[in-house]
Amino acid sequence: MLKIVGFGSGAKDNMTLEAFAAISDARLIVGYKTYVNILKQYFPEKEYYSTDMMQEKERCQYAIDKAEEGLKVVLVCSGDSGIYGMAGLVYELAQKRVQIKVISGVTAASSGAAILGAPLSHDFAVISLSDCMTPWELIKKRVRAAADSDMVMCIYNPSSRRRAGYLKEACEIVSKIQSQDTICGYVKNIGRDNEKAEILTLKELAECDVDMFTTVYIGNSHTKVIDGRMVTPRGYKVI
């Protein structure tokens, strides 16, 4: 059996019990090199196989091959393995060659939201600004549709060296529909030693320095700051 495991933010306390048990039981851990390096501090006795960014197919195929040989293999992903993770690709590649079990993890949308307060208490859209797999024009269309619907947006992969201006452009799209004073927030390096969180306006967010390890939240027209926390009301009547 091949287990595809989402291990959360990387902090041991952020792993689900099921994810921790699956990794503990495995002989071989396969994953992106940054994630493998995180797990080595918790599971130093395991065998590891890692690849770089843009080598996802190779690492998934390796995990499938080793599971087919009878090894206890886990393919690890940060956050949840079914949300921008490797679960879908493994199903496409495996074609019933091995039994697959997907083990959910805490995705950045959830863990980052908890740090900021409660920004996702109503309908929201999760959108990645990475155009490696999705054309930028289609991503912008989705951002526009979410803003038109007055949904909170949780933005994954907001920036990189090659895509330095993408978040600013996304904010400009939203600002044509929503107020520039819309409450927003971001969390960098969730659950890690250099974690940083900030609540700010849409106008300020457009000029913000973010990276691939940042999760961004753009509020809706009802999102507000309560006691220093970003909160999107669900709609309950509060006396």
Please state what every model-predicted region is.
Residues 7-14, 134-136, 198-200:
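Short gly/ser/thr-rich secondary-structure transition/capping motifs
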Residues 42, 86-87, 113-114, 137-138, ...:
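Short, well-ordered secondary-structure micro-motifs
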Residues 2-4, 72, 148-239:
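A contiguous loop/helix-start segment that scaffolds small-molecule binding in enzyme catalytic cores
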Residues 85-149:
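Class I SAM-dependent methyltransferase SAM-binding "motif I" and its flanking Rossmann-like core
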Residues 7-9, 31-34, 51-53, 78-80, ...:
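Fold-independent oxyanion-binding glycine-rich loops
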Residues 71-77, 119-131, 203-212:
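A polyampholytic, Gly/Pro-enriched intrinsically disordered region
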Residues 1-103, 111, 206:
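Class I S-adenosyl-L-methionine
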